[in-house]
Swiss-Prot record:
<dbReference type="InterPro" id="IPR001947">
    <property type="entry name" value="Scorpion_toxinS_K_inh"/>
</dbReference>
<keyword id="KW-0964">Secreted</keyword>
<feature type="disulfide bond">
    <location>
        <begin position="36"/>
        <end position="56"/>
    </location>
</feature>
<protein>
    <recommendedName>
        <fullName>Potassium channel toxin alpha-KTx 15.9</fullName>
    </recommendedName>
</protein>
<dbReference type="GO" id="GO:0005576">
    <property type="term" value="C:extracellular region"/>
</dbReference>
<comment type="similarity">
    <text>Belongs to the short scorpion toxin superfamily. Potassium channel inhibitor family. Alpha-KTx 15 subfamily.</text>
</comment>
<dbReference type="GO" id="GO:0008200">
    <property type="term" value="F:ion channel inhibitor activity"/>
</dbReference>
<dbReference type="Pfam" id="PF00451">
    <property type="entry name" value="Toxin_2"/>
</dbReference>
<feature type="signal peptide">
    <location>
        <begin position="1"/>
        <end position="22"/>
    </location>
</feature>
<keyword id="KW-0872">Ion channel impairing toxin</keyword>
<keyword id="KW-0800">Toxin</keyword>
<comment type="function">
    <text>Blocker of A-type voltage-gated potassium channels of cerebellar granular cells. May also inhibit Kv4/KCND when coexpressed with DPP6 or DPP10. The occlusion of the outer entry of the K(+) conducting pore is partially reversible and affects both open and closed channels. It shares the same target in rat brain than BmTX3 (AC Q8I0L5) and AmmTX3 (AC P60208). Has been shown to weakly inhibit TRPV1 channels.</text>
</comment>
<keyword id="KW-1015">Disulfide bond</keyword>
<keyword id="KW-0732">Signal</keyword>
<keyword id="KW-0528">Neurotoxin</keyword>
<dbReference type="GO" id="GO:0090729">
    <property type="term" value="F:toxin activity"/>
</dbReference>
<keyword id="KW-0632">Potassium channel impairing toxin</keyword>
Amino acid sequence: MKIFLPVLVMLILCSMCLLTEGQVSTNKKCSNTSQCYKTCEKVVGVAAGKCMNGKCICYP
């Protein structure tokens, strides 16, 4: 039981690192998600992304 907490913390930290590596930030300004599709298709090859804080974020 003593090892459970450290293993759980390590699992959470590793999961956070893997999830943040999966997104590509661009400098393309946007006001809605549909403006990001063409940019994401050029950057990562897939039209999968969204507009966050006025910039396109793409997901490969």
